Amino acid sequence: MSTNKFVVRITNALFKSSLASNSPPVYPKRIRHFEILPNEKWVIWGPGKGKFLDVLNNKYICEPPLSLRFGFLKESSNILPRIEQVAFKGVMPTAHLSARYEYFKDDYDQTCKQFIFDKASGSNAVSYKVETNNRQINMELYNALVENLNLSSLQDRWVMGLSNGQMRRARLARSILKEPDLLLIDDPFLGLDPAAIATISQFLAKYDSIEVSGGCPIVIGLRYQDTIPAWCTHICCVDEKNGILFEGPIEKLQSKMDETRSRALKELEQLKKASNSKEDISINDLICIHPMYGKKEHEIIKMPHLIELDGLSVSYKGEAVLENLHWKVQPGSKWHIRGDNGSGKSTLLSLLTAEHPQSWNSRVIDNGVPRRTGKTNYFDLNSKIGMSSPELHAIFLKNAGGRLNIRESVATGYHEASSNNYLPIWKRLDKNSQEIVNMYLKYFGLDKDADSVLFEQLSVSDQKLVLFVRSLIKMPQILILDEAFSGMEVEPMMRCHEFLEEWPGTVLVVAHVAEETPKCAHYLRLISPGEYEIGDMEN
């Protein structure tokens, strides 16, 4: 790679999504010059990072045709560039939420090793696999990847059993094992705990020095609020509407970066003040119909615990995940559920929503009543729960993203039975329920294009916002927010956090980044099976 003069070069280019004459350009102005050289480590920074990574991935049509060039291709080559783009949106796709926890029953599951190889598919019920390509696997590189990404002990684990952080590392290994010419990674640290962030960051910092890989240039995408790793050498600040604002060596642009970040925060505060001054729908207007609204402390303490775990233990094939867990949740309380990736947080939440095969356990007590097979109804339990999570996001996008608009997407939150129901319901709602949807859309700034924009056409941030509003709409007793704000822009996230401070129901939050964590009064920290901490937050 070092013999090439450049990796990627853009010269006086205009990018479009199609050849149609009326197709609008991705950015209104031409990109005069942008270049990545060997040994440079770039971060694409700001709200336009996703589009720009797509530009580098050759996903758009460039005018003139040779205005986007790749230095690792020969001038006369007809071979397309080998570019791997890794976007972390949810976990391994599954047909329904409970499949995430029924992985040991899935006839078409793969081990972590098979997933990283990405060569075959087949059933666990038979002894053979169907080869999907004839690509030769570089086993030296594979061994180096699993060692450096801490995947050695996970090679034989089923993919559906991996935590979000483990799955993130496996996806990274899968892409790099294809030995691409260029690796693009959007939000590499999103939703990860500090230990997982350190593992991936250290790996990316030294990747080009792993001898068996041969190395390839890596470009990452980060938001304004993200910490830029010290190993990044260059930055390209991209606005979603105007394209490149500035680019070059980080050491020469630090003051400009500080100014841009500061200006973005000031604009955010101004938007917030303007919004508050003009607001004709208050938070009280939105929450006054919640069953817990207006409840006094002396009334709440007389109620049974909404959730009680009385020495709960859960294991997979003899391996403990949760052990002897005692936890009580009072109605209306707000909890931050903490723990490293793989500590059992997702398992705990799946038990509460009855998506886990071991949910029917008398040591799980709902409103003072122990769960028992045949006595406790899955649909009754979920009628009281609202949820937003990476798993739900991935499944909603796949199953409903191309057919439901914003208003219809939010309205599906009214389905009593489960958060996993995406069937259209808007036209069947009564006028009162429709008005509630409309009020929520207006308050959260989603009303303008609510009928004309499909869910899949939204940015990741707006998709997250729609799913958050969807989780509120049926006034659930329990609101589960599993990484609900990872990937959300600062302004809507702050609005959501402000709203949650007034929300009268019980809230269970999983978040690894302090800025993405709404205010909570208590915390449960899972450390290892049988070891945990419960305490009060210091807000």
From Swiss-Prot:
PANTHER family hit by this protein: ABC TRANSPORTER I FAMILY MEMBER 10
SUPFAM superfamilies: P-loop containing nucleoside triphosphate hydrolases (SSF52540)
GO cellular component labels: mitochondrion
Pfam families assigned: ABC_tran
Domain ABC transporter: 8-265, 307-537
GO molecular function, one term: ATP binding
InterPro entries: AAA+_ATPase, ABC_transporter-like_ATP-bd, Molybdenum_import_ModC, P-loop_NTPase
Record's miscellaneous remark: Present with 1580 molecules/cell in log phase SD medium.
Main location: mitochondrion
Induction: Induced by transcription factor YRM1.
Protein name, as recorded: Uncharacterized ABC transporter ATP-binding protein YDR061W
Family: Belongs to the ABC transporter superfamily.
Swiss-Prot/TrEMBL keywords: ATP-binding, Mitochondrion, Nucleotide-binding, Repeat
Binding positions for ATP per the UniProt entry: 339-346
Subcellular compartments: Mitochondrion
PROSITE patterns: ABC_TRANSPORTER_2 (PS50893)
ATP-binding is among the record's keywords: yes
